[in-house]
From Swiss-Prot:
Binds 1 zinc ion per subunit. It is found in: Cell membrane. Zn(2+) binds at H347, H351, H357. Synthesized as an inactive form which is proteolytically cleaved to generate an active enzyme. Processing at the upstream site is particularly important for activation of the proenzyme, whereas processing at the boundary between the pro-domain and the catalytic domain does not appear to be essential. Inhibited by hydroxamic acid-based inhibitors. Residues 212-406 form the Peptidase M12B domain. This is Disintegrin and metalloproteinase domain-containing protein 9. GO terms for cellular component: cell surface; cytoplasm; external side of plasma membrane; extracellular space; plasma membrane. The lineage of its organism: Eukaryota, Metazoa, Chordata, Craniata, Vertebrata. Its EC number is 3.4.24.-. Glycans are attached at N144, N154, N231, N381, N487, N636.
Length: 845
């Protein structure tokens, strides 16, 4: 966030200074050194004035925000500056070497550096990057032009040289493209119908609203160090200025440059810099992978060389910014200024960020030429094509490391709320007040989380809350990659890891290399479509032995190198069964070579000498039994240092990742895959949420309670008619049974009469001791009541003694019989004494 506009008092004082002529060019005060201006086609000598409330004062080390007035190009420019607190981390490191070649490390105090960034008042989307250590030295980017400013040598009046950047004379630098392509691109840049750079900025920021951060590491070679008088402090300050300029260029794409480290080869160059640019680049990225990246984490490393390569300004890999093995570039820093050199580094770093050359494409940047012009024009503006290329990289999940916002302990220690970097003491930083209006998680005025928020940014943060442990935050991209998961207590996704280089893949026909399974068929299909496949070995030998642009094994100096027979499979890729033209957005040159009954297809993308050709065989490709391609040579696969003992270390239930830790299969637990678990590794994060069982419990309740109940309800609804009928039938049967039971208990019912001797036994009429019912002979009465016949005297205990029942209420049959007592049958009981003889009734005849 820059300083505020001038107060009325300051504006009045400014007009007074202008009226007195104190801010105009001071040509008579001093003359520029010829060596300082010989490379400039035009310039002005100016005296910047620092704006304060009362008087001009010297720049102090504690100045966080300053403003200057510059009168140049017939206009008055008021620039507002603030110290670039994002430029250097608190743990900024400088590596050097002693005379014995031993590595030395130093953490210089950079908390009070004098490198500033800012803007020009009244100029929309302007950017300023200057060093105020000894005068003002840096760049001013206006609407459609860029200017340089630097102190005038031997001046005692604070005089400076102010010059347009496109007016610098320099040795032509090229990237190997034809003049026709360069002229075509230059013509396109002059077309008036193209939108302004302001419109470009608005459009890009709408597409890429999330800021990316490039953690840059710079390496300076021995010759450049000697050229600077073997002064480590001077080299360090020069590279910090370089990083500040880069930051001012990339900010238009919403990309920030953070210089995380510097290495100066003070004793000797640890790599061979003899040969062509491709050779040196290959040597540098191999050294980086083996030594530098193991010492200090970074996203891209750029080598600064004094040596030139026949007019080639530099070289870098395309789209490899987060790669462990290819995220690097080389840059020639000869007899040019740091401001001019910044455009070269911005160009090569742009290749790492997925940007191709603008040549031959409909590109515009609001200037005559753009940064990604292959002619290394010294422009300060990125084109619409560069923005689109970077957008494609991000949409294809490339550059994931750029979302790694520097953590508070890695950021510059002087906090600045509103710079979109989380400084020490801050929990979040949403930027300007306007940007914070749409941030739901962060309080812009305090850079603290809102009361309900757990986080405000990161791959494992959603709706201001941590994603649950086990949530995948980085998916698996190939059979040689592994996924990463959130841990439930951090907004950051774990660092990207993959299966260790050298692990067999594609049914043991290839090796894993940097997270990809490298084999010829896959490379042919990427270029020529899904039906293409690798050509026979004879094709590789015949084509790559020629040593031209369509068949070679890299460069030897500025010339193509012929492939030896043993290295032919590591040169230009040769394919057959080609039915589709290349699927790349850039149309390459295609060559077809007949060879022994087949057609060998190859391509040359003409990307320039600063970009490795995608038509070459990929490094890590299996070129023979136990061998891989490395730097255009077929070498033993032992260079991959694969040492994973799957059976011993991972117990046969996992593989080793790039950190040489076991990544376990599903069902086994890290770190050694010897116990039951959920898979993953100590590097990937938990593959499940060990603390939360809500999902599991919910599923159990759903499947074992809710689902059965719903199924039962559906069954009952479908069978409701049948069930209703069955229920009615059962109820009717039960009712009938009760009615029959009631009828059986009716008094005087002849059907239930029993003889005294037991159930279902009737006695002949007129027998001894049997009374006859009033209804006629042959009808027996129930025993036990009055009028029940008893055995005659003298029979003793021949018959059981009846038990008399309680008196029952009177019954009224349809045909009333005479009143009769009712007794119940008691079965065969043995009385304790003989019962009295029952009374005898005579029939009513």
């Amino acid at each position: 966030m820059g300083p505020r506009a001038l107060s009325p008092l300051a504006s009045l004082r400014l007009r007074w200074l202008l009226a007195c002529g104190l801010l105009g060019p001071v040509l008579e005060a001093g003359r520029p050194d010829l060596e300082q201006t010989v490379h400039l086609s035009s310039y002005e000598i100016i005296t910047p004035w620092r704006l304060t409330r009362e008087r001009r004062e010297a720049l102090g080390p504690s100045s966080q925000q300053i403003s200057y007035v510059i009168q140049a190009q017939g206009k008055q420019h008021i620039i507002h500056l603030e110290r670039n607190t994002d430029l250097l981390p608190n743990d900024f490191v400088v590596y050097t070497y002693d005379k014995e070649g031993s590595l030395l490390s130093d953490h210089p105090n950079v908390q009070s550096h004098c490198h500033y960034r800012g803007y020009v008042e009244g100029v929309q989307n302007s950017a300023v990057a200057v060093s105020a250590c000894f005068g003002l030295r840096g760049l001013l980017h206006l609407e459609n032009a860029s200017f340089g400013i630097e102190p005038l040598h031997n001046s005692s009046h604070f005089e400076h040289i102010f010059y347009p950047m496109d007016g610098i004379h320099q040795e032509p630098l090229r990237c190997g493209v034809s003049n026709r392509d360069t002229e075509k691109e230059g013509t396109q840049g002059d077309e008036e119908e193209h939108p302004s750079v302001t419109q470009l900025l608005r459009r890009r920021r709408a597409v890429l609203p999330q800021t990316r951060y490039v953690e840059l590491f710079i390496v300076v070679d021995k010759e450049r160090y000697d050229m600077m008088g073997r002064n480590q402090t001077a080299v360090r300050e020069e590279m910090i200025r370089l990083a500040n300029y880069l930051d001012s260029m990339y900010i238009m794409l919403n990309i920030r440059i953070v210089l995380v480290g510097l290495e100066i080869w003070t004793d000797r160059n640890p790599i061979n810099i003899i040969g062509g640019a491709g050779d040196v680049l290959g040597n540098f990225v191999q050294w980086r992978e083996k030594f530098l990246i193991t010492r200090w984490r970074h996203d891209s490393a750029q080598l600064v060389l004094k040596k030139g390569f026949g007019g080639t300004a530099g070289m870098a890999f395309v789209g490899t910014v987060c790669s462990r093995s290819h995220a690097g570039g080389i840059n020639v820093f000869g007899q040019i200024t740091v401001e001019t050199f910044a455009s070269i580094v911005a160009h090569e770093l742009g290749h790492n960020l997925g940007m191709n050359h603008d040549d031959g494409r409909e590109c515009f940047c609001g200037a005559k030429s753009c940064i990604m012009n292959s002619g290394a024009s010294g422009s300060r503006n990125f084109s619409s094509c560069s923005a689109e290329d970077f957008e494609k990289l991000t949409l294809n999940k490339g550059g994931s490391c750029l979302l790694n916002i520097p953590k508070p302990d890695e950021a510059y220690s002087a906090p600045s709320c509103g710079n979109k970097l989380v400084d020490p003491g801050e929990e979040c930083d949403c930027g300007t007040a306007k940007e914070c209006e749409v941030d739901p998680c962060c309080e812009g005025s305090t850079c603290k989380l809102k009361s309900f928020a757990e986080c405000a940014y990161g791959d494992c943060c959603k709706d201001c809350q941590f994603l649950p442990g086990g949530s995948m935050c980085r998916g698996k991209t190939s059979e040689c990659d592994v996924p990463e998961y959130c841990n439930g207590s951090s907004q950051f996704c774990p660092p990207d890891v993959f299966i260790q280089n050298g692990y067999p893949c594609q049914n043991s026909k290839a090796y894993c290399y940097n997270g990809m399974c490298q084999y010829y068929d896959a490379q042919c299909q990427v270029i020529f479509g899904s039906k293409a496949k690798a050509a026979p070995r004879d094709c590789f030998i015949e084509v790559n032995s020629k040593g031209d642009r369509f068949g070679n094994c890299g460069f030897s100096g500025s010339e193509y190198k012929k492939c030896a027979t043993g290295n032919a499979l590591c040169g230009k890729l040769q394919c057959e069964n080609v039915q589709d033209m290349p699927v790349f957005g850039i149309v390459p040159a295609i060559i077809q070579t007949p060879s022994r009954g087949t057609k060998c297809w190859g391509v040359d993308f003409q990307l320039g000498s600063d970009v490795p050709d995608p038509g070459m065989v990929n490094e890590g490709t299996k070129c023979d039994a136990g061998k891989i391609c490395r730097n255009f040579q077929c070498v033993n696969a032992s260079v991959l240092n694969y040492d994973c003992d799957i059976q011993g270390k991972c117990h046969g239930h996992g593989v080793c990742n790039s950190n040489k830790n076991c990544h376990c299969e599903d069902g086994w637990a890290p770190p050694h895959c010897d116990t039951k678990g959920y898979g993953g590794s100590v590097d990937s994060g938990p593959t499940y949420n060990a603390k939360s069982t809500a999902l599991r419990d919910g599923l159990l309740v759903f499947f074992f309670l809710i689902v059965p109940l719903v199924a039962a309800a559906i069954f009952l609804f479908i069978k409701r008619d049948e069930l209703r009928k069955t229920f009615r039938k059962k109820r009717s049967q039960m009712s009938d049974g009760r009615n029959q039971a009631n009828v059986s208990r009716q008094p005087g019912d002849p059907s239930i009469s029993r003889p005294p001797g037991g159930p279902n036994v009737s006695r002949p009429p007129g027998g001894p001791g049997v009374s006859r019912p009033p209804g006629g002979p042959g009808v027996s009465r129930p025993p036990g009541g009055p009028g029940v016949s008893r055995p005659p005297p003298g029979h003793g205990n021949r018959f059981p003694v009846p038990t008399y029942a309680a008196k029952q209420p009177a019954q009224f049959p349809s045909r009333p019989p005479p009143p009769q007592p009712k007794i119940s049958s008691q079965g065969n009981l043995i009385p304790a004494r003989p019962a009295p003889a029952p009374p005898l009734y005579s029939s009513l005849t």
